Amino acid sequence: MSKNYHIAVLPGDGIGPEVMTQALKVLDAVRNRFAMRITTSHYDVGGAAIDNHGQPLPPATVEGCEQADAVLFGSVGGPKWEHLPPDQQPERGALLPLRKHFKLFSNLRPAKLYQGLEAFCPLRADIAANGFDILCVRELTGGIYFGQPKGREGSGQYEKAFDTEVYHRFEIERIARIAFESARKRRHKVTSIDKANVLQSSILWREIVNEIATEYPDVELAHMYIDNATMQLIKDPSQFDVLLCSNLFGDILSDECAMITGSMGMLPSASLNEQGFGLYEPAGGSAPDITGKNIANPIAQILSLALLLRYSLDADDAACAIERAINRALEEGIRTGDLARGAAAVSTDEMGDIIARYVAEGV
């Protein structure tokens, strides 16, 4: 008998509920085709939770997530709540506390240039023609954003500010293993990003990544300095499979990877802890300007579901089925408005229906 799984669904604000509806259509198709026993429960988060419960992350939402195998997250935020104190606004008051509560130390951001969408890539046509499929693995809880001491002191010409880059062995080991395990499900290559010619933290990073690599003889490892990596991503992104990055370097490179795909509406992300529990969400925002118009691109939310199936439920076949269905739809020229460029566009609902049907049919 197949295992029972439970997903906490947090649609959130803006286009979140609209695109989440499409992801759940696809989940229904997955359940039926693969005979998976998956249940869902919905919870308020972000602005919707502020309106209904007076806070962006109600205790009931946290409890619901604790009882789930994974969290499928929509998007939060909007002009309606911008007047609130920063720590009570939807983004800082919901998403960041969730990451902290569940000790989500790794962030996975796929960036793929889909066939037929080369015209949206800002790179030269000959570079875009080669395509690319990159997974950026970023460490989330260490590094210069959290290292101590940090602060400001002094005055006049002696006023100064300082931050500290700190990484512990265990932090590097666990994020490296995420990268190597991910590479085993892809094209078996990890490129570790550092600045080991200057930074002591990067020297330790490189040493430990080399140690972990011995556990994965089937995965090729390369090292690259961050400054060179930013250039190589523009020159030839097809050379990369998995990028392994510290918090700061991953913050930079994941956004660069996102930009060269040409559409934020296509980009999912996953944040994982050591137990495989994850929070899965689109990389884009709540897009209040198009909310309720049935024109939002739901693919990033649907791909976030695929990541959830792959990493938290260990259902790679189901994840691949979703990805194939999306590829098929795009190859057939099916586009939402953000990708149509004057051609006929389908609605949010129609795109969800098409992808769900293709999953069910096993295209």
UniProtKB/Swiss-Prot annotation:
List the residue(s) that the UniProt entry marks as the site Important for catalysis.
Answer: 145, 195
Output this protein's name: 3-isopropylmalate dehydrogenase
Q: Which UniProt keywords apply?
A: Amino-acid biosynthesis, Branched-chain amino acid biosynthesis, Cytoplasm, Leucine biosynthesis, Magnesium, Manganese, Metal-binding, NAD, Oxidoreductase
- PROSITE patterns in the record, alphabetically? IDH_IMDH
Instruction: Report the EC code(s) recorded for this entry.
Output: 1.1.1.85
Q: Which cofactor does it need?
A: Mg(2+); Mn(2+)
Lineage, opening ranks: Bacteria, Pseudomonadati, Pseudomonadota, Gammaproteobacteria, Enterobacterales
Per the similarity annotation, which family is this? Belongs to the isocitrate and isopropylmalate dehydrogenases family. LeuB type 1 subfamily.
Binding-site residues, NAD(+): 78-91, 285-297
